[in-house]
Amino acid sequence: MQKLIILLLVAAVLMSTQALFQEKRRKEKIDLLSKRKTDAEKQHKRLCPDYTDPCSNAYECCSWNCHNGHCTG
């Protein structure tokens, strides 16, 4: 009987440890996606000039389709 209780306790500890590692991996994936988004925004700011853009989505209007401060694409 004691062996069964010990086995159940060990199983519970292993399951909770696995859940903790899964949560850690999930957070790491979220952090990586957030970093990629931040890197993309930094690249956009580097490639795209600061100007008042009449376009509805200023993120799409970058230096290669910008003419005299207005989006052409």
From Swiss-Prot:
Family: Belongs to the conotoxin O2 superfamily.
Localization (cell): Secreted
Protein name (database record): Conotoxin Vc6.17
Function: Inhibits voltage-gated ion channels.
Record organism: Conus victoriae (Queen Victoria cone)
InterPro entries, alphabetized: Conotoxin
One example GO MF annotation: ion channel inhibitor activity
GO cellular component terms given for this protein: extracellular region
Domain of life: Eukaryota
